[in-house]
Design a protein with these regions (language model features):
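Metal-dependent nuclease catalytic regions and adjoining charged, substrate-binding loops involved
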Residues: 4-5, 138-290
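Metal-dependent nuclease catalytic cores that hydrolyze phosphodiester bonds in DNA/RNA
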Residues: 1-109, 116-129, 140, 153, ...
Length: 290
């Protein structure tokens, strides 16, 4: 990856954003396999061409700093911390991962995260759950009796004022959540991972434009909506999934009402995919807007 410095930030800041990481053929990390196959492969293929500005990597730097501090802490006799490991997935492919802490006494694998308070407010934990489940499966594969995943998240935008005013808002700037995984969940995770590597294997032979499309979930897709609006009012009276339903509502309400189309979007593609410049779907998205 090419790190730019549009704000002319001090060299130590840019150095912190720069990584000498190089992709290893046929080795995919847990975070990579949980992305869309298209995104994961495009990132690898175009790593030497992808540009990112140091100023846009501030939270990645913050996350790395947190991990570095916690890495130097003392674990107990039953705990392992900051361990890189890999599992053979067949045909020369490997699944790799780094867990932050594993407690052998409880079978719990813990990962430290930085996140927004709103992630907690909205209960958007599926990605965390999937990641720790993958770690549990991997630890099982190398002989540990792992059975629980846990996230300890530092909430970078936490507000004491909001915490005092709203009991549903996270009450502390650190949030802890965990999941006890059943034998069935762990087994199904292994089946999914093996299937994922089969997808990757097939996709690696395809040119960029023929790579399988990321799913709507992987693209963070929001569908088109049709808003019923009223003259003199800025917010929608009601939102509909189809233009026909919205039009029926307008006909019932009368002359002062009208339909406004609100196009859907793939926000991951638009704002959070580092390989978007090499993706035909992204190019189509921005061309449609233009």
């Amino acid at each position: 990856m090419i790190i730019t410095n549009e704000l002319n930030l001090p060299a130590p800041f840019v150095d912190a954003a720069t990584s000498d990481y190089k992709y290893t053929p046929k080795r995919y990390s847990v975070t990579s396999v949980l992305k869309g196959v298209r995104e994961a492969i495009l990132q690898r293929r175009h790593d030497d061409e992808i540009e990112q500005d140091a100023a846009d990597m501030v939270w990645a730097i913050f996350g790395s700093a947190v991990h570095s501090i916690l890495e130097n802490s003392q674990e107990t006799a039953e705990q392992l911390k900051e361990n890189w490991f890999s599992v053979d997935m067949g045909d020369g492919y490997e699944l790799s991962g780094i867990f932050d802490l594993y407690d052998d006494a409880t079978g719990t694998v813990t990962d430290y995260k930085t996140a927004t308070a709103w992630k907690v407010v909205f209960g958007e934990f599926d990605d965390w759950k999937r990641q720790t489940l993958c770690y549990v499966w991997m630890l099982r594969a190398i002989g540990f009796d792992a059975k629980r995943g846990e996230i300890v998240a530092m909430l970078k935008d936490h507000s004491k004022t909001k915490a005092k005013a709203d009991h549903t808002y996270p009450q502390h700037p650190v949030y802890r959540i965990g999941w006890d995984f059943s034998e069935q969940e762990i087994a199904e995770c292994g089946e999914w991972l093996r299937g994922r590597f089969e997808e990757i294997k097939r996709a690696e032979a395809l040119p960029d434009d023929e790579l399988p499309m990321c799913t709507e979930e992987e693209r963070w897709h929001k569908a088109d909506k049709w808003a019923v609006m009223k003259e003199g009012r800025k917010t929608a009276v009601k939102l509909y999934d189809s233009e026909e339903e919205a039009q029926e509502c307008v006909e019932e309400e009368g002359d002062k009402f009208y339909v406004e189309h609100r196009p859907g979007d793939d926000s991951k593609c638009r704002d959070y995919c580092s390989a978007c410049a090499f993706c035909s779907h992204y190019k189509e998205l921005i061309n449609n807007v233009d």
